[in-house]
Amino acid sequence: MLKRIISGICLVIITAPALYFGGWFLYALCLFISLVGNYELLRVAGLEKSPLGICAYVSTVVYYILLDSADNRYSMLVIVAAFLAMMTIYVFTFPKYKAENIMWSFFGIIYVTMMLAYIYETRRLDNGVYLVWLIFVSSWGNDTFAYFTGVLIGKHKMAPILSPKKSIEGAIGGIVGATALGVI
C-alpha cells in the first residue's frame, strides 16, 4: 500500500504541472510515456528490438508529429500505414513472426499511443484544463472507491482467475465513486 501511495504522489508531481500548463510540456510527456509504454508492452512479447517494435516506435513519433500539426486529420493515416508496414514485415520475414506478434505491435500503437494522445487533445479544447482533470479524477476516484468498497464489503468475486481480489461490489463502488466525483 505504501508503494502505491508513493507512486501516486510521484505521478501527481509530474503530471499536475504538465496538465496545468499543457502545450509542449504535456505534448513531450505524452510522447515520452507513449514510447516507454510501447517499449514495455513489446518487451513482454520479446519484440522491443525487432522490426515490428521499431515500426511501432516510429509510428508513435510520426503520429505525435502529425497530431500537433496545423492539419492533424492525417494522423489516422499513420495508423493505417503502421498496420500495412507491420503486415509487410510479417509477409517478407515469414515464418519468423506470428500473427500475434503483429497484434502486440499494433495494439501498442492503438492502446498506448492513441489513448495518451487523447489526453493531449482534450487539454487543447476550450476548458480543456478542467476536462483533462476530470478524466484523471474520475479514473483515480474509480480505483480508490473500488478498492475501499471491495475491501470493506466485497464478497462476490468478479473474475477469480484473472484478478482474485476484485469484487462486483468493488466495481459498483468504483463506478458510483467516479460518478460522484465527476458531478462534484
Protein language model regions, located:
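Membrane-embedded alpha-helical bundles of polytopic integral membrane proteins
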Residues: 1-184
